[in-house]
């Protein structure tokens, strides 16, 4: 078995909502930013990154009909060569084919770079907080009544260090690694966190694979 190490930075190009509820619904309760309970620093959970990578890759590889047939649930099948299941894993407890082996991709939490940590400390000293509040309104089409809400966002320009590891057990895994890079590019084209369709969560990846710089922006998606 070979392990590929993916390391690098995630740069927030727009304010990003990484909330404790996992998504934002206009008119709902405020969704505070996820923080390390020991340091109170913002971070991006590995599950948020991996979940978005998987979701977008499912749309690309499986298409609407397959996703609709599964009623929008996470894809899991008994095909040993299914790239989605091999890369991201299958749900525990399902009676599925075991020949594909363990989950190949491990995605770890992404933490602030030293520079961004200092920048947010300075922001908190000046403004009293290290995040920003974005105000939104849901307008009733008949009465024009506005229902305001606010969302806490990590500001644009903040960088996070991230790391992933990918198990290569056979030749199929070598082929599927390109799909991991495709998934990262898809996240760049879409976004991460809540309210992506309303301008939140645009990101850029700078990555190295086993120490070699890889430009995912040039991938043909």
Predicted regions: what is each one?
Residues 1-132, 147-221:
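RNA-binding basic/glycine-rich loop and surface signature characteristic of RAMP-family CRISPR effectors
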